[in-house]
Structures are given as structure tokens and as C-alpha cells.
A protein has these predicted regions:
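Flexible "stalk/tail and boundary" regions
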Residues: 1-9, 13, 23-101, 108-183
Length: 183
């Protein structure tokens, strides 16, 4: 599952967040597929983890969170290296089931103590998970990122080639496609 997009939402007085409808459809379809395979009962389950660096919450689909946990189990790192991370991440992670209205419940602990979100939030798709930011913080972060790194909006194929932006320092050393001197 790939999550994309930016959605402005509100966390209600009962700490419920409505999952954006197109993402809800993806999560429901995945839960139904897993139910038909006998892997679950069809309930949409997500795992909510804090990201104190950004003051955001990360929302992981159940299957992806299980994959991440399995990767930790299979990590070549020693138990002494992995265990402190596990002792922090897993206790601070909350399991949440999506209700019939497409909402998940967020804990007071996450909202008030770990990331301090108010009711106006931005839900953003970040490839394999969602993030929930304060709306103002997300917009400020986006503006700052685009001002400092405009090359992030390059075509995905260009980004995958890891080529420097034609306007970036050092790019003049290398002929650019279409440049008559590149023959």
C-alpha cells in the first residue's frame, strides 16, 4: 500500500481522528483481502507511534507494522543494540481499530504528552504510513523544506537517478541532456 496526499482534519473532543476517505478505502480493501486469506477478521487495525523529533504521530497499517517488527527480530544487530529501541518503541505504540465511521481513537498520552497536537491537524501520506501533524507545523515545515530544497519536487525518475539539480553548485561541471557540448 502506498499512501499519498495531504488532508486537513480535526481531532474531535473524544480524541477521534477521521481517516481520509480514499485512504480509508485502501485500508478497508487491504483488511478485506487479508480476511479472505484468513489473516484477520476484516477489521481495519493501525498502530500509532509518536515521532517526538517532528511532534507528529505515525500511523502504520497492521500488516506493515508486523513487517517492521519482524525486521527487528531478524536484524543482524545484537540484542543489546535492538532491545533499548524495542523497549521504547513498543510501549509507546498504541493499537487502534477503525470504527464504522472511519475514525481511529488517539490516546491522551500521545496527544498531550508526547507530541502535543491540538485539534487542527494535517494527515499526510508518507509512502508506507501516514503522519499526523499540527496543521500549522506541517505547513511551516513544508514551506521551509521547499525553500531550502526545491529539487525535492523534481520528477521521480530524476530523483531515483540521484542526479544533481541543473541549478545546483557543481552541476555545470557535467554536460546536461540536450546540451550541444554533450556529444
Amino acid at each position: 500500500m502506498v499512501f499519498t496526499g495531504f488532508y486537513e482534519h480535526t481531532i474531535d473532543a473524544k480524541n477521534r481522528l477521521a481517516i481520509p476517505s480514499d485512504i480509508r478505502k485502501q485500508l478497508t480493501a487491504e483488511a478485506n483481502r487479508r480476511a479472505s486469506d484468513g489473516d484477520c477478521d476484516g477489521t481495519v487495525v493501525v498502530y500509532v507511534t509518536p515521532d517526538p523529533k517532528t511532534n507528529a504521530l505515525m500511523i502504520w497499517p497492521e500488516a506493515r507494522f508486523a513487517e517492521l517488527a519482524k525486521m527487528l527480530d531478524q536484524s543482524p544487530r545484537s540484542l543489546a543494540e535492538v532491545l533499548p529501541f524495542e523497549r521504547t518503541m513498543f510501549p509507546l505504540t498504541a493499537r487502534s481499530e477503525m470504527d464504522k465511521q472511519g475514525r481511529i481513537r488517539l490516546s491522551d498520552f500521545h496527544l498531550k504528552q508526547l507530541v502535543k497536537l491540538d485539534s487542527d491537524v494535517a494527515v499526510i501520506g508518507v509512502n508506507d504510513h501516514l503522519e499526523v501533524w499540527s496543521r500549522d507545523a506541517w505547513m511551516a515545515n513544508l514551506t521551509q523544506t521547499l525553500e531550502q530544497s526545491p529539487h525535492l519536487l523534481m520528477h521521480p525518475r530524476e530523483a531515483l537517478r540521484n542526479e544533481p539539480d541543473p541549478g545546483s553548485p557543481g552541476s555545470q561541471d557535467k554536460p546536461q541532456p540536450g546540451d550541444p557540448t554533450s556529444n
